[in-house]
UniProtKB/Swiss-Prot annotation:
UniProt keyword Lyase, yes or no: yes
Domain of life, source organism: Eukaryota
Gene name, Swiss-Prot/TrEMBL: Aldoc
EC number: 4.1.2.13
Keywords: Acetylation, Glycolysis, Lyase, Phosphoprotein, Schiff base
Site (Necessary for preference for fructose 1,6-bisphosphate over fructose 1-phosphate) location in chain: Y363
Full protein name: Fructose-bisphosphate aldolase C
Pathway stated in the Swiss-Prot or TrEMBL entry: Carbohydrate degradation; glycolysis; D-glyceraldehyde 3-phosphate and glycerone phosphate from D-glucose: step 4/4
Amino acid sequence: MPHSYPALSAEQKKELSDIALRIVAPGKGILAADESVGSMAKRLSQIGVENTEENRRLYRQVLFSADDRVKKCIGGVIFFHETLYQKDDNGVPFVRTIQEKGILVGIKVDKGVVPLAGTDGETTTQGLDGLLERCAQYKKDGADFAKWRCVLKISDRTPSALAILENANVLARYASICQQNGIVPIVEPEILPDGDHDLKRCQFVTEKVLAAVYKALSDHHVYLEGTLLKPNMVTPGHACPIKYSPEEIAMATVTALRRTVPPAVPGVTFLSGGQSEEEASLNLNAINRCSLPRPWALTFSYGRALQASALSAWRGQRDNAGAATEEFIKRAEMNGLAAQGKYEGSGDGGAAAQSLYVANHAY
């Protein structure tokens, strides 16, 4: 086998590794605030608010105006392109607001899922064209990490070998391009919770998908110490009649990761996948209490599971902004504890216990 040319210098590797470690420092995770305009339409319609650029800005301001309490539990915030260039009411760019708290800025760079021909309704993700130039610009504009989401689903015939391979290679190409531009890639192969499959089936599929992803990352000479993984937790399908405990979910999840994710990866930042806010916190907590050795930081990269209570409290009213921000801070602190295995549960019925599941979820 020919020797691979060193794609990254020692300085580039150190920068990437330092960024990744900062994001997943003990007790810290990621706020995923990278919903597309279409996804924001769904969120805002739930509270009867029109999906305008100004309303999206006002909502993001609710999250980003959180005080210094979030510094200890949020290591990074993922922005959508529009948000990266928006400002708060005082004319301060959101990027600067976040950076001044010592939190790193990330950017969603994929362009959404598209059908994968020759499969049973499976998809790949587009956005590689022009990615090199976009990454260079985003780095100049303050982004230190990026996110790219691929989607797989479980059914009798899926995921197919073709879909697994194609999505693994797309993620690897994206990761390589990011690293060349000093941006840490978050690799997100999401296995949707749609279906009635049990925990074992999800664990089996998760292992096959992650094994393919890390083979592709190796083939593309991606520097693992300068990456993060954003997987689904191993959970039963949403329509599965069997209910599993957080401890069972934790054991299946950590087992799948131990079989597939190299210890060189600094951190695993789970997506919430339509779990309720409380469920996502309890499961993350159980994962961090799991008796199996865990060489990576195991933390959160939550969107809906950090925002649902805040969105309900805000309802598009300026007068509610302060209360909504408090709801977000409260949830962020709870997940910061869960990322250390120190969360005891909120006992919260209400909004925090509401399922956030969306069938066939697209961003």
